[in-house]
Regions:
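Flexible helix-coil junctions and inter-repeat linker/turn elements that act as hinges
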Residues: 42-46, 84-93, 136-147, 193-204, ...
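Extended amphipathic alpha-helical scaffold segments
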Residues: 356, 389-393, 406-409, 434-485, ...
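HEAT/HEAT-like alpha-solenoid repeats
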Residues: 100, 109, 156-159, 211-213, ...
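Amphipathic alpha-helical scaffolding segments
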Residues: 150-157, 205-212, 233-239, 251-257, ...
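Short inter-helical turns and helix N-cap capping residues of alpha-solenoid HEAT/ARM repeat scaffolds
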Residues: 69, 123, 180, 224, ...
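Acidic/polar, low-complexity linker and loop regions
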Residues: 203, 330-348, 352-355, 367-373, ...
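Extended amphipathic secondary-structure runs
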Residues: 450-472, 508-560
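Long amphipathic alpha-helical scaffold regions
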Residues: 10-370
Length: 603
């Protein structure tokens, strides 16, 4: 057997020399020599029979199986895999290569594969060559025999989930060479090849194979960078953008568990010590994929939903009322708002996913979360009914500021058309106030938190509170316009809903005295903050007058001061623009406030 092993090793060296040939002429000569060899290594036993390829090599493999020669059991499938990889791009080898792949999938050769694939998991040297050979078979000639390979899945897919699970020692070995061949990596490459080249029912079966796909994703964050990138690109190309793959299969592929594993890749670049010469960010790549998956109903995760109307509500019908009953409107037990603590949603997968995202960690996760909210507005109230935020005191820390940015972006989201019910017309009934309020001023923004922000001597936090209150009140103003739209005989219900919404918004807003105090103590030279606070004052008077009129505030002297400053000939254009913005806001306050003393001479 020594001479056989020596001959196989020589063949292996020859194949590798073709791959590494520097001169094209040398490579061409060696390929011609290999082609002549292949022509002598193919034969048919009878008319209509499949060709027999490399009979001596296969006989050696069979002999190794019979005699338990692990050295030959390792080298033969390895050489066959190298051969297929070497000739895969050479058109003149197509016929021989396809014949060889078919021959290897015959019963006698499948028995040899079975020997390798049933070996103890610790014997990677027996299993991995078989996986590499199967990978080359499924990819050869664009998947010419991929379907035949899958039809033998009782052998060719045996224990793949087991091979995808790394040993404990491999998980603990943080110094593991990223380029080293491991059983898991070979199994992953095999799965990727099947996702690429299988089609129809075969691909659907693989995608829906829960144990395999779960094991495939399980330790993704510990996989080498190049493999992770290949996996991300395969998901994009072979799952997301495969229009022939059924939506139901995509839904199973993008299960809660698998999506959670993909989300962990946001932290890959921070934890990985592996060199990144290409400068490709794993976080950016997975972000693109998740943005696509989570915001398009075609990809199996996002489901159509009804925006601000929770699952189970029916805003198109009014219950019949007995003529002797007192009409209490939305205060009737029929309309009890039962969504303060939990909101039923259709998008269960996304509801789970958004809870594991970390908007306090990076801007990419904020972008994904806000994009999900925009695509499925039903999830906003669901998210805030479960998520605890702003547990620490307002401080200009990275986590606090990123959470602030997330809340700001959430409030900035547009009001769903017809409150999300459909694209054609407003429903009869208004949405529950407890759902709407979370889209305007989410519950992490309590009166206590916002008041502390306004009273802090930290400009960035104070300005955040001012800005976020302003956009929230402007959004409330727009919601009221929607509620005042002609709703026919149900207009009284919409008017009542507007009042109920105010009843939930008001307790979350800081008191007027705190806003006035902030405006008065803001330095005159800080024109940016003065303009922002003046705009907030105007919003209080115009949008939440019930809060504004709790305090008397005469802006006469403020107006006089602004006019004087505008008359300064040395005023810069930028400062003039800021003062004009402030003037517009203070004039709105003056036109609304009942505390103005227009005819009193300034002291």
């Amino acid at each position: 057997m020594a001479h056989r092993r020596k001959g196989i090793n020589k063949f292996k060296e020859f194949l590798l020399s073709i791959t590494h040939a520097e001169k094209e002429s040398d490579k061409s000569n060696k390929l011609n020599l290999l082609k002549s060899c292949c022509d002598l290594q193919i034969s048919r036993t009878g008319e209509g029979d499949e060709p027999v390829c490399f009979p001596d090599l296969i006989q050696t493999w069979s002999f190794a199986d019979s005699n338990n020669n692990e050295s030959l059991l390792t080298i033969v499938p390895s050489v066959l895999a190298i051969f297929l990889k070497t000739v895969s791009q050479q058109l003149e080898f197509r016929e021989f290569g396809v014949a060889l792949c078919k021959f290897l999938l015959q019963k006698d050769q499948l028995r040899l594969f079975n020997r390798g694939l049933t070996a103890n998991k610790s014997k990677e040297h027996l299993i991995s060559p078989c996986l590499r050979l199967l990978t080359e078979i499924v990819t050869f000639d664009g998947g010419a025999v991929a379907q035949q390979l899958y039809s033998r899945r009782y052998i060719t897919f045996k224990r793949i989930d087991v091979f995808l699970t790394p040993n404990k020692s491999q998980l603990e070995d943080v110094s593991d060479d990223a380029q080293r061949s491991t059983l898991r990596r070979n199994a992953q490459r095999y799965v990727l090849a099947n996702l690429r080249f299988q089609h129809g029912a075969a691909k659907t079966d693989i995608v829906e194979e829960h144990k395999v796909i779960k094991a495939f994703f399980e330790f993704l964050r510990k996989d080498p960078r190049d493999l992770v990138l290949d996996i991300i690109r395969s998901i994009d190309r072979d799952i997301i953008h495969d229009s022939l793959l059924p939506r139901s299969a995509k839904t199973k592929f993008f299960s809660r568990w698998n999506l959670e594993r993909l989300v962990t890749l946001y932290g890959y670049d921070k934890e990985s010590e592996e060199p990144n010469p290409a400068g490709v960010s794993i976080a950016n790549e997975i972000h693109k994929v998740l943005m696509t998956i989570c915001t398009d109903t075609a990809h199996g995760v996002l489901l159509p939903q009804n925006g601000w109307y929770p699952v189970g509500s029916d805003p198109e019908s009014l219950p019949t009322m007995d003529e002797h009953c007192l009409d209490m409107g939305l205060d009737s037990p029929v309309y009890v708002d039962k969504y303060r603590e939990s909101v039923p949603v259709r998008n269960g997968i996304l509801s789970y996913l958004i809870q594991i995202l970390r908007p306090d960690v990076d801007s990419l996760q904020i972008e994904l979360l806000v994009a999900i909210f925009k695509a499925a507005p039903e999830l906003v109230a669901d998210f805030f009914s479960k998520k605890t935020m702003f547990v620490s005191d307002p401080k200009p820390t990275a986590s606090w500021m990123t959470e602030s940015a997330f809340l700001y972006s959430t409030i900035e989201l547009p009001i769903p058309a017809n409150c999300g019910w459909n694209d054609y017309e407003m429903p009869v009934m208004p949405p529950p106030a407890s759902v709407v309020v979370e889209n305007i001023l989410p519950r992490p923004l309590t009166r206590k938190i916002l008041t502390r922000c306004l009273n802090l001597n930290t400009d960035i936090i104070t300005l955040f509170a001012v800005r976020i209150l302003t956009i929230a009140l402007n959004k409330l103003r727009n919601v009221r316009k929607l509620y005042r739209y002609e709703h026919g005989p149900c207009q009284s219900l919409w008017n009542q809903a507007s009042q109920k919404l105010d009843g939930q918004i008001y307790p979350r807003c800081p008191e007027m005295k705190d806003v006035i105090s902030l405006y008065k103590r803001t330095p005159k030279e800080d024109l940016q903050q003065q303009e922002a606070v003046a705009e907030l004052l105007a919003c209080y008077y115009q949008v939440v007058p019930g809060l504004a009129f709790e305090e008397k505030y005469d802006v006469t002297l403020t107006l006089v001061d602004i006019f004087k400053r505008l008359e300064n000939p040395d005023l810069r254009p930028k400062d003039s623009e800021s003062l004009m913005g402030q003037l517009r806001s203070i004039l709105k306050v003056a036109s609304t406030s009942g505390s103005m003393r227009w005819w009193q001479k300034p002291g």
